[in-house]
A protein has these predicted regions:
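N-terminal helical cap/lid subdomain that shapes the substrate entry/recognition surface
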Residues: 1-94
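Conserved Lys-Pro-Asp/Glu-containing loop-to-beta segment of HAD-superfamily phosphomonoesterases
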Residues: 147-176
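Conserved H-loop
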Residues: 21, 70, 132-136, 164
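Substrate-recognition element of Asp-dependent hydrolases with the DxDx(T/V) motif
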Residues: 74-93, 97-128, 135-141
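Hydrophobic/aromatic beta-strand patches that form the interior of the parallel beta-sheet core
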Residues: 112, 139, 169-171, 190
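Short phosphate-binding/catalytic loops that engage adenosine nucleotides
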Residues: 20, 109, 187
């Protein structure tokens, strides 16, 4: 819903309060342009070898810089959370998720989260939903600079947590990103 006019009215108000004057539609267009520019730059930097992931903080920071306004990292983080809160309809878990994660933990399994997501708002959402305690490790694409289905993202997780791909199982909600990506890294999936 990042195209929603209500979102961009609120975002332009926040930017304006910080001294960066944007009209809502102008801000949305500038935001979309910055994302495309960053994605293109990352693809060039990586020579097409993987699926790059931008960090939304850099986009917001550049939007302020374009208006000659400096902001703190906390202000960027707060803006990202506001952006997310306005742009989603609700934040809820699929039924049975905490119970399933607890059963895995009770069975002595290690549970890791590998997600195509922006850390600035996803990490607080994971905490808000009470899920942090279930994970032995969390790797978010904006922190890694790469996203699923790129095998490099899976390999980062394997290396960081000293995991053997033959002993791992990937479950997810996207056949291409989750299952095919896992298979490319030698991880079984369901």
């Amino acid at each position: 819903r990042s195209s929603d006019l209500y979102l961009w009215k609120k975002m332009s108000l926040f930017f304006g309060m910080k001294g960066a004057a944007y009209e809502p539609k102008e801000l949305r267009m500038a935001y979309e342009t910055k994302i495309k520019e960053q994605e293109a730059a990352l693809k060039m930097e990586c020579r097409g070898s993987h699926v790059p992931e931008i960090d939304i903080a850099d986009v917001f920071r550049q939007l302020f810089e374009d208006q000659a306004v400096s902001v703190t990292e906390k202000e960027i983080a707060d803006l990202a959370k506001m952006f997310r809160a306005i742009s989603i309809e609700e934040l809820k878990l699929f039924p049975g998720v905490p119970e399933m994660l607890q059963r895995l933990k009770d069975a002595g399994k290690k549970v890791f989260l590998l997600s195509n997501a922006q850390a600035l708002f996803t990490a607080p959402e994971i905490s808000l939903l009470g899920l942090t305690k279930y994970f032995d490790g969390i790797l978010l694409s904006s922190d890694a600079g790469v996203k699923k289905p790129d095998p490099a993202f899976y390999e980062m997780l394997l290396k960081q947590y000293h995991l053997d791909p033959a002993e791992c199982l990937m479950t997810g909600n996207d056949d291409i990103a989750d299952c095919h990506g896992a298979a490319s890294a030698g991880i079984a999936s369901r």
